[in-house]
């Protein structure tokens, strides 16, 4: 696997879930797998759970782990292409990526949407540059449009607790004081569709997600109606592109 950024990258989903559950039952059965291997975790944005859980997972596999908070404790990096570098950013990301790749075996990247231009966000410029230029397998620890690690964990939780083969899963928009990006709901929708659950999305009008993530899900603006008969409810806030 050269990259893990979306559900399609994981291959056979049922097999992936089964293997994840097997590892969960005995977290230390593959401690030799990562011997003499190094994971580099790069954070362009803050993280708590993803940072800790990913680092712990790598340690369980016997890997060495390096963590870099970009623009904090390292040179500020310019991520836009074609700009004049006469500001406070000392190095361009394209120059730094091969250097980073030379010191590790796997790279995890966390880079949020700027939420100013949807088309630009959906290009996933930062993540894609690592995939193209690092020479290493790259996985997303949340990007502009998806959060595959969280969605995989959500799917595993549903599989562990479901009482019927094809449960009804409802993702409902919830209020939040801050404007949150769409990566988590996009990704959750993608994974629920891939799992072929009875999947419903409910939100106020104007908060529609991109059709490529909604997929085969039913969209119901009436929250009460959407929640009827739900086996699992996933509450998440997201902002709308204006």
Regions found by a protein language model. Give the residues of each.
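Positively charged, low-complexity intrinsically disordered leader regions
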Residues: 1-52, 56
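Generic detector of short, locally flexible boundary/turn motifs and exposed helical patches
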Residues: 3-10, 30-32, 71-74, 105, ...
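Generic alpha-helical secondary structure signal
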Residues: 10-14, 91-94, 125, 212, ...
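A short acidic, often aromatic-flanked loop/helix-cap motif at beta-alpha or helix-coil junctions
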Residues: 11, 144-149, 208, 224-228
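Phosphate/diphosphate ligand-binding glycine-rich loop within oxidoreductases
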Residues: 34-41, 47-159
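Glycine-rich phosphate/diphosphate-binding loop of Rossmann-like nucleotide-binding domains
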Residues: 44-67, 159-236, 241
């Amino acid at each position: 696997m050269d990259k893990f950024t979306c559900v399609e990258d994981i291959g056979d989903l049922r097999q992936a879930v089964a293997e994840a559950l097997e590892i969960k039952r005995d977290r230390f059965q593959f401690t030799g797998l990562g011997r003499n291997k190094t994971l580099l975790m790069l954070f362009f944005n803050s993280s708590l759970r993803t940072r800790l859980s990913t680092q712990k997972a790598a340690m369980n596999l016997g890997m060495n782990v390096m963590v870099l908070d970009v623009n904090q404790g390292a040179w500020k990096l310019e991520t836009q292409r074609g700009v004049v570098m006469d500001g406070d950013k000392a190095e361009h990301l394209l120059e730094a990526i091969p250097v980073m790749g030379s010191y590790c075996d796997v790279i995890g990247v966390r880079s949020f949407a700027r939420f100013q231009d949807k088309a630009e966000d959906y290009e996933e410029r930062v993540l894609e540059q690592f995939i193209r230029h690092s020479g290493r397998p790259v996985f997303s620890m949340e990007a502009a449009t998806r959060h595959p690690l969280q969605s995989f964990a959500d799917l595993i939780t549903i599989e562990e607790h479901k009482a019927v083969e094809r449960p009804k899963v409802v993702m409902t928009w919830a209020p939040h004081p801050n404007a949150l990006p769409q990566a988590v709901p996009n990704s959750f929708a993608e994974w629920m569709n891939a799992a072929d659950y009875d999947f419903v999305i409910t939100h106020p009008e104007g908060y529609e997600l991109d059709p490529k993530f909604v997929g085969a899900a039913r969209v119901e603006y009436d929250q009460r109606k959407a929640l009827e008969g739900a086996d699992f409810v996933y509450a998440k806030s997201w902002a709308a592109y204006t």
